[in-house]
Amino acid sequence: MASGVEVLRFQLPGHEAATLRNMNQLRAEERFCDVTIVADSLKFRGHKVILAACSPFLRDQFLLNPSSELQVSLMHSARIVADLLLSCYTGALEFAVRDIVNYLTAASYLQMEHVVEKCRNALSQFIEPKIGLKEDGVSEASLVSSISATKSLLPPARTPKPAPKPPPPPPLPPPLLRPVKLEFPLDEDLELKAEEEDEDEDEDVSDICIVKVESALEVAHRLKPPGGLGGGLGIGGSVGGHLGELAQSSVPPSTVAPPQGVVKACYSLSEDAEGEGLLLIPGGRASVGATSGLVEAAAVAMAARGAGGSLGAGGSRGPLPGGFSGGNPLKNIKCTKCPEVFQGVEKLVFHMRAQHFIFMCPRCGKQFNHSSNLNRHMNVHRGVKSHSCGICGKCFTQKSTLHDHLNLHSGARPYRCSYCDVRFAHKPAIRRHLKEQHGKTTAENVLEASVAEINVLIR
């Protein structure tokens, strides 16, 4: 642009408000309306661009469903939905105080954060009312009647002490946050939890393939961290600390280690995803006592996990099978899954892998019944996110987590509690609900649903 060109700039005051008024007038006359929102008996004709700009939920719905009619399932009256949709055009919302929780929940469902924030601020006035209300001429009876509408939903409000400045409103109590919090959890926070809970739902095919055999000395040298044996196997303070302790208390260097070896195994279901694990088997010798102790410690750790011990984040170790304390690696040990007895923990570990199909994660010590579960678990440690959302572009490690994430875009809640008929968009959410509220498992929930269906058919 030439430097001598003069530019005129006009700011049109009130343009946004005038445009919305004109759009609302066109909506009332049903002109240029390109979508109909259906909720029970309500049929709201409007414009996609206006509704999508005010509600990310509706925006995602329009992207997934390009038709001219959209069904919205809300557990509220059609009047509440109509008021919220109309506020997209008018910028105003008016309702009775007793309905504030219903409007807050419905606005949270539609992801209308500006309405949610206003409802929270208004609700905080009833949680801790200010003393100045009575001094301004508001009678005590009217104040009590205003608070009684929400008394059944709120905890008892504490009496504030007189002060020149009223205290800031407290955060919203848990009972009011629960509907919002349960429906929109963070996907990345649930990813590792969902991976752990879904590990037993894959196919029963075992596809282990041994690709390399190394001696115990080679493996110990490759896995040994710079600071010593305390962080063995890359487990960092949890399993690694226990392996380091066992390695230090192992046989002296002059002692000849028992026959043993280490197999590095590769587990994979596809070319672009694979996992690694360690398997101890008889055969081969290690000439260094510390190396022998490390391998024995890994075997003890695997045996402890097989006996019900925990080598996860808690770092606790369960009792070893057959009362094995780690002092004598050649002591007879009984398998916890069958009546067989073995001399030496390394033979027990080999037996458990060969006969009982137990796979172990070399990063955290978690054990799996199938290599596919280990393969999927290892992707979490690697940070591999090969499943992406086609709507917002967010990536996930697990395919099941992506499916749950898509439920937020579509508004679907496919997971239903058979005990209280509450629905959830995320599988980990219903698992947590069943455990905390009913003390049940997912299998018991499915069984309860089947029993209820049978009862309906019989009647």
UniProtKB/Swiss-Prot annotation:
Membrane-traversing stretches: none
Modified residues (Phosphothreonine): 19
Pfam family name, one: BTB
GO biological process, one term: regulation of cytokine production
GO cellular component terms, semicolon-separated: nucleoplasm
Entry keyword Cell wall biogenesis/degradation: no
Residues in BTB domain copies: 33-97
Gene3D superfamilies: Classic Zinc Finger (3.30.160.60), Potassium Channel Kv1.1, Chain A (3.30.710.10)
Protein localization: Nucleus
Taxonomic superkingdom: Eukaryota
Zn-finger region bounds: C2H2-type: 333-356, 359-381, 387-409, 415-438
Protein name listed in UniProt: Zinc finger and BTB domain-containing protein 12
Organism of origin: Homo sapiens
